[in-house]
Swiss-Prot record:
Residues annotated as transmembrane: 13-33, 82-102, 115-135, 161-181, 198-218, 248-268, 283-303, 321-341
GO cellular component term, pick one: plasma membrane
Annotated protein name in UniProt: NADH-quinone oxidoreductase subunit H
GO molecular function list: NADH dehydrogenase activity; oxidoreductase activity, acting on NAD(P)H, quinone or similar compound as acceptor; quinone binding
EC number: 7.1.1.-
Keywords of the record: Cell inner membrane, Cell membrane, Membrane, NAD, Quinone, Translocase, Transmembrane, Transmembrane helix, Ubiquinone
InterPro entries membership: NADH_UbQ_OxRdtase_su1/FPO, NADH_UbQ_OxRdtase_su1_CS
Organism: Mesorhizobium japonicum (strain LMG 29417 / CECT 9101 / MAFF 303099) (Mesorhizobium loti (strain MAFF 303099))
This protein's record includes keyword Nucleotide-binding: no
EC main group: translocase
Lineage: Bacteria, Pseudomonadati, Pseudomonadota, Alphaproteobacteria, Hyphomicrobiales
Length: 347
């Protein structure tokens, strides 16, 4: 009985506890990321933004949560009720489950698997099904058009993200997310005789791929200027037109969790994960998880500024950018990186 408890029950309870802690912390973080997004956008437009609920409006996201939860969900009479209600749940659950392999510090991951980056890539690819299910089940032309756009857009930019992952794999020699972070500790700067700093991280050595990943992440998560899936001027709200109350909240939650996930991936692949920007005191005194969160916030700030300053692309411009610009550049970078590592022996 003791053996059964130690080998089966206790590990399962630990995983459950880690999952609950992760979900609670993630949801609170997403609430404040949403608050920051609204504040940044307001500052650019010379507005105040949320400033009523709580000190300086810091509890606005929680007030919105209560508002959505206590509203009555309205289901269109012609909708497929089962798929209509399942779609937002699929979107939210898939977005959260991708975080199982994200290391926010050394050894801080629910599952430290050797193919972690492929797991995240697969989960992010599946998220489009929630959008397609919601658009089809609504039995309305605007949600359906939004769902079709989503399918084409996500498939187009996943190709570029895939080549970015291949490039990072070549430099790190591993698909394990923790190994990818640790490989940036002694990067190109250190090998050239420079001090161990943020110049060792992949953002410098793979700068074109960093830019491609950043822009592709915007398209993958339907963020401006690539928010054509839910373009207000054309499709009202895209696949979420017919949704209200908790189902709408789940779609909204899944969208922002996916955005923060892409910020975390950019941090892990290009910004050194939990590594400090300078490998000496007092920077090494700061816990790695603090550096990780600060880097995620830095990437998200860039995403928010793009939303505030860049106008929305036309759909043909979006597809042309993905297939005629990013695909050739990313493919060339894969070949160039492989050739460089082979010739110089840096791998």
């Amino acid at each position: 009985m003791d053996t059964f408890f130690s080998f089966y029950v206790l590990p399962a309870l630990l995983i459950l506890l880690k999952s609950v802690v992760l979900i609670v912390v993630l949801l609170i973080f997403v609430a404040y990321i949403l608050y920051a997004d609204r504040k940044i956008w307001a500052a650019v437009q010379l507005r105040r933004g949320p400033n009523v609920v709580g000190p300086w409006g810091t509890l606005q996201a929680f007030a919105d949560l209560l508002k959505f939860v206590f509203k009555e969900p309205v289901i269109p009479s012609g909708a497929n009720k089962g798929v209509f209600l399942l779609a937002p749940l699929v979107s939210a659950v898939l977005a959260i489950s991708a975080w199982a392999v994200i290391p926010v510090n050394q050894g801080w991951a629910i599952a430290n698997v050797n193919v972690g980056i492929l797991y995240v890539f697969a989960i992010s690819s599946l998220e489009v099904y929630g959008v397609i299910m919601g658009g089809w089940a609504s039995n309305s032309k605007y949600p359906f058009l939004g769902a079709l756009r989503s399918a084409a857009q996500m498939v187009s930019y996943e190709v570029s993200i895939g080549f970015v992952i291949v490039t990072v794999l070549l430099t790190a020699g591993s698909l394990n997310l923790s190994d990818i972070v640790l490989s940036q500790h002694d990067g190109i700067g250190t090998r050239l005789g420079l001090p161990n700093t943020f110049l060792d991280w992949n953002w410098l050595a793979l700068f074109p791929m960093f830019i491609i990943f950043f822009i592709s992440a915007l398209a993958e998560t339907n963020r401006p200027p690539f928010d054509l899936v839910e373009a207000e001027s054309e499709l009202v709200a895209g696949h979420m037109v017919e949704y209200s109350s908790t189902p709408f909240l789940l779609f909204f939650l899944g969208e922002y969790v996916a955005i923060v996930l892409m910020c975390a991936l950019a941090t892990i692949l290009f910004l050194g994960g939990w590594l400090p920007p300078f490998d000496f005191v007092p920077f090494t005194w700061v816990p790695g998880v603090i550096w990780f969160v600060l880097k995620v916030c830095f990437v998200f700030f860039g995403i928010s500024m793009v939303k505030a300053f860049v106008p929305r692309y036309r759909y043909d411009q979006l597809m042309r950018l993905g297939w005629k610009v990013f695909l050739p550049i990313s493919l060339f970078m894969v070949v160039a990186t492989a050739a460089f590592l082979k010739i110089t022996g840096f791998a």
